Amino acid sequence: KAGQKCTAVRRIIVPENLIDEVEKSIAQRLGKTTIGDPAQEGVRMGALATKTQVDRVRENVDLLSKSQKIVFGDLDGFEVMGADKKLGSFFSPILFRNNDPFKKTDCHDIEAFGPVSTIMPYKEIEDAVELAKMGKGSLVSSIVTPDDKEAREYVVGAASMHGRILVLNKDCAKESTGH
């Protein structure tokens, strides 16, 4: 779907002591993403819906780039397998990092509607709830934590802004298919 679904991950809110590790892990996974014709074996991400969508996603990436840093992805320097990059509507996955998400708020307001996400740190669970609410609502949110109390606090605090909340811990994460 190349990030073009209403439940695509747009904002990744991470405890500040884990953000470097999580960013590295996400970048490694994204680095293994093969872009191209989905009928080709090994391709993990196809094209955006239209060339107009490519232009819109690029415009939104340009806007987001004013307040945060791209830590993975390249708007032009990516390979496409089994298709013509110039004829198709292909787009590299982009991962931004926003170290000050309470002051640099574009990531909460701009939805690229493509393979674009922003990773951001929080200090306390209350901060994570507030950051989640700054997105002004979504169809789905997730929390991944081994702490049931923390999960409960997040769900109660963020529920009014999200259609559903997926709670994952080490036991149920193995079974989860995502959103």
Task: Pin down the residues of each PLM region.
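Conserved C-terminal structural/oligomerization subdomain of aldehyde/semialdehyde dehydrogenase
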Residues: 83-179
